[in-house]
Amino acid sequence: MAKDVRFDTDARNRMLKGVNTLADAVKVTLGPKGRNVVIDKSFGAPRITKDGVSVAKEIELEDKFENMGAQMVKEVASRTNDEAGDGTTTATVLAQAIIKEGLKSVAAGMNPMDLKRGIDLAVTKVIAEIQGSAREVADSDEVAQVGTISANGEAEIGRQIADAMQKVGNDGVITVEENKGLETETDVVEGMQFDRGYLSPYFVTNPDKMIAELDDCLILLHEKKLSSLQPMVPLLETVIQSGKPLLIIAEDVEGEALATLVVNKLRGGLKIAAVKAPGFGDRRKAMLQDIAILTGGQVIAEDLGMKLESVTMDMLGTAKRLTISKDETTIVDGAGNKPEIEARVAQIRQQIEESTSDYDREKLQERVAKLAGGVAVIKVGGMSEIEVKERKDRVDDALNATRAAVQEGIVVGGGVALVQGGKSLAGLEGENADQNAGIAIVRRALEAPLRQIAENSGVDGSVVAGKIRESDDNAFGFNAQTEEYGDLFKFGVIDPAKVVRTALQDAASVAGLLITTEAMVADKPAKEGAPAGGGMPDMGGMGGMM
């Protein structure tokens, strides 16, 4: 296919037009008084959102060169979202500001490579300043404040997330789902839960709720299928004498083995239940080992030369309470050794760092949470499906922001951390005038998010930026929600340092690539009216065959 090639100023101007189209659509959502964007869907109701990355993902431009610019900025939003989970609009605004200023300098005859080096120097310095000024999250009130800011000022969302984090710990899994009702509520599952239920409804001990509840329970972990209970008879007799209930977790319990367990349960001789082991393949082995460490038992594995005939009581795990429904099993208060559990968590964390697959990383993260804390589910409610989806976007953002705050600490919000970081560039010098111009570009661009937040609140951004530049107090800023100046930490206007850092890094990285672009290549659009495949343009002679 023939290609269309553009060079120099023409290429950069087309690209800048695409950047501006996307960034202008995204930046209206920034800040507590940011506006909504309505996105048309090919089926169903349109989607209403204030989530920057959701807006960016929907934008495709007709002109191929403009579209390339838009896609590059879309990449900024996506990368920031993947790494920090929030700050996508800030990243987009920063990228637009750096690209605009950078392309002006290139048009004025400056060397693009030196400009990029100057930009990189400035960004490194500002990031060091942001990380240096970050402070740890002190209490759940600050967690709630971070969540509230990220959820566009909705305090209830911030509170729900703070409650969930308090209950399951910083390592616990928090998932967000849509609720059928109007209320937004948080359910917490303590202990380890996995998605396998009882193998027979005859194991149920609470017929009203159709669940099996076993207190002070022994747990047998077997790696293979159980088809016959003959090898286990000595163990089962010992369990009956102990008077404790028994849960069997195996790859499967089938045929005669399951029938024997059910008959013994119904006769009242044995308090017992059986469930399949969670996961598949190697992940199943790993999860069985997790359960073993959590409950202080051993996995009966033929690879290790262990046979069911030789299993003794001290090889069984124990837990204070077990709840088994038809779909899931929850183990609460396992008798595992704390240092061993911590060592296992550290081992899985190491695997998370080394993993290259997002899916594997997510599954490993779930395993850490199940061992370390628990699982909380935030169920988002609303008056309509559109409202629920819009709120769910904001809850997701807020959740990611609070996690980021716990990891790297918090800084003043409202775009002020970037402006304060920019003050550290006062004495920074590059190797030549063009590098100094790159440093100046970053210094000016750092004010863009603050200006945009003010503009979206109906206030003059230049006036706000000027006041904050003049102040020596690093926490002094503009609260766009109440339109007053003061200590942003006291106002509860705070941002996670990780989100601010990631937004700036990703914006500068992509902006640097665009500034140093000299040529662009795209497919030429097909001429209108050309036959699609060349053959059989006229089917008129086949009319008589109808």
Curated annotation (Swiss-Prot):
CDD domains: GroEL
EC class (word): isomerase
Cross-referenced Pfam families: Cpn60_TCP1
Region (Disordered): 526-546
EC nos: 5.6.1.7
Superkingdom per UniProt: Bacteria
Reactions performed catalytically: ATP + H2O + a folded polypeptide = ADP + phosphate + an unfolded polypeptide
Residues engaged in binding ATP: 29-32, 50, 86-90, 414, 495
Keyword Oxidoreductase set for record: no
Any one cellular-component term (Gene Ontology): cytoplasm
Chief localization: cytoplasm
Bias (Gly residues): 531-546
Intracellular or extracellular location(s): Cytoplasm
Keywords, alphabetical: ATP-binding, Chaperone, Cytoplasm, Isomerase, Nucleotide-binding
Keyword Isomerase among UniProt keywords: yes
MF GO annotations: ATP binding; ATP-dependent protein folding chaperone; isomerase activity; unfolded protein binding
Record-level GO BP terms: protein refolding
Family in the record: Belongs to the chaperonin (HSP60) family.
Subunit (UniProt): Forms a cylinder of 14 subunits composed of two heptameric rings stacked back-to-back. Interacts with the co-chaperonin GroES.
Function text: Together with its co-chaperonin GroES, plays an essential role in assisting protein folding. The GroEL-GroES system forms a nano-cage that allows encapsulation of the non-native substrate proteins and provides a physical environment optimized to promote and accelerate protein folding.
NCBIfam families: GroEL, PRK00013.1, PRK12849.1, PRK12850.1, PRK12851.1
Protein name as catalogued: Chaperonin GroEL
UniProt organism field: Jannaschia sp. (strain CCS1)
Gene: groEL
